[in-house]
Amino acid sequence: MASVSLLSALAVRLLRPTHGCHPRLQPFHLAAVRNEAVVISGRKLAQQIKQEVQQEVEEWVASGNKRPHLSVILVGDNPASHSYVLNKTRAAAEVGINSETIVKPASVSEEELLNSIRKLNNDENVDGLLVQLPLPEHIDERKVCNAVSPDKDVDGFHVINVGRMCLDQYSMLPATPWGVWEIIKRTGIPTLGKNVVVAGRSKNVGMPIAMLLHTDGAHERPGGDATVTISHRYTPKEQLKKHTILADIVISAAGIPNLITADMIKEGAAVIDVGINRVQDPVTAKPKLVGDVDFEGVKKKAGYITPVPGGVGPMTVAMLMKNTIIAAKKVLRPEELEVFKSKQRGVATN
């Protein structure tokens, strides 16, 4: 009798609905019948999105439009940046988007970099433009991000896109936060009225993730209608734990290995790991990538979890491709774009 009861309980855990009529086990989960978290495959989800983008690109071209073009500016010789850019250009080729990488030395002046951006802004053949971050210390990253034309800003970092996002209006969404949103949405994890903790408040990742999850879902862009708590470097870990232990969804984007451990997570919570940290493998003594979450410990308690690598990273690249086809279709509101172009020409606007 005890074994029958155990099997019944396990069946209830695996099959209970999580969003509407969707069962617990969704496509793109790496799961077996076991009493631990469903591991969400970001690679498989990203492949699905890239297939959607590829179809959209081919339909766009078949309608008589030019093939979308993505320009990437890469400054310096940071190996990680070179690897990220290569992943982006490979993905572009995969979905039928033309791309180019413009490499600048680490010694490039800020003004020279800004001039290159202006030329690409004015190039009608360029639909999407991104400058790979981080940049050398002598270059103001915020100034560079704001120099990219908002309608070509596939990173979603321009102040106009950030502002529109905060106002529940259509904008280019930052790729990583949008990727996190798509993981949650496509996995069927409910957000309406749920408690969410976002560890990390960076302007490019943590803050926009929180914005997407807490905002009204009735507007033009994604909105999760969740109750969101944001922590940061000055949040004591014990204080963080008081929030995460109550959270239905925990998203860590702090860049701190083992920040989130099993004792901080409530049973069945969804844990999304955005962290990318390079540490030394204690067995091989070689460098390896880990996230912010103690993966092995947390997956025994959580309901869903993303791995590092293979979780959020591939989704970031996929959403960049989605932003590029959006940029090619020129759907940004013309009034904001005209203000930006007037300022670039040095024309005063009211």
Curated annotation (Swiss-Prot):
Coiled coil: none annotated. Although its dehydrogenase activity is NAD-specific, it can also utilize NADP at a reduced efficiency. Its main location: mitochondrion. The modification N6-acetyllysine is found at residue 50. Residues 1-35 form a transit peptide. This is Bifunctional methylenetetrahydrofolate dehydrogenase/cyclohydrolase, mitochondrial. The keyword Hydrolase applies. This NAD-dependent bifunctional enzyme has very different kinetic properties than the larger NADP-dependent trifunctional enzyme and is unique in that it requires formation of an enzyme-magnesium complex to allow binding of NAD. NAD(+) binds at residues 200-202, 233. Substrate binds at residues 84-88, 131-133, 309-313. GO terms for cellular component: mitochondrial matrix; mitochondrion. Its EC number is 1.5.1.15, 3.5.4.9. It comes from the Eukaryota. There is a cross-link at residue 50 (Glycyl lysine isopeptide (Lys-Gly) (interchain with G-Cter in SUMO2)). It comes from Mus musculus (Mouse). The lineage of its organism: Eukaryota, Metazoa, Chordata, Craniata, Vertebrata. PANTHER family: BIFUNCTIONAL METHYLENETETRAHYDROFOLATE DEHYDROGENASE_CYCLOHYDROLASE, MITOCHONDRIAL, C-1-TETRAHYDROFOLATE SYNTHASE, CYTOPLASMIC-RELATED. Keywords: Acetylation, Hydrolase, Isopeptide bond, Magnesium, Mitochondrion, Multifunctional enzyme, NAD, NADP, One-carbon metabolism, Oxidoreductase, Transit peptide, Ubl conjugation. Belongs to the tetrahydrofolate dehydrogenase/cyclohydrolase family. InterPro entries: Aminoacid_DH-like_N_sf, NAD(P)-bd_dom_sf, THF_DH/CycHdrlase, THF_DH/CycHdrlase_cat_dom, THF_DH/CycHdrlase_CS, THF_DH/CycHdrlase_NAD-bd_dom. GO terms for molecular function: magnesium ion binding; methenyltetrahydrofolate cyclohydrolase activity; methylenetetrahydrofolate dehydrogenase (NAD+) activity; methylenetetrahydrofolate dehydrogenase (NADP+) activity; phosphate ion binding. The gene is Mthfd2.
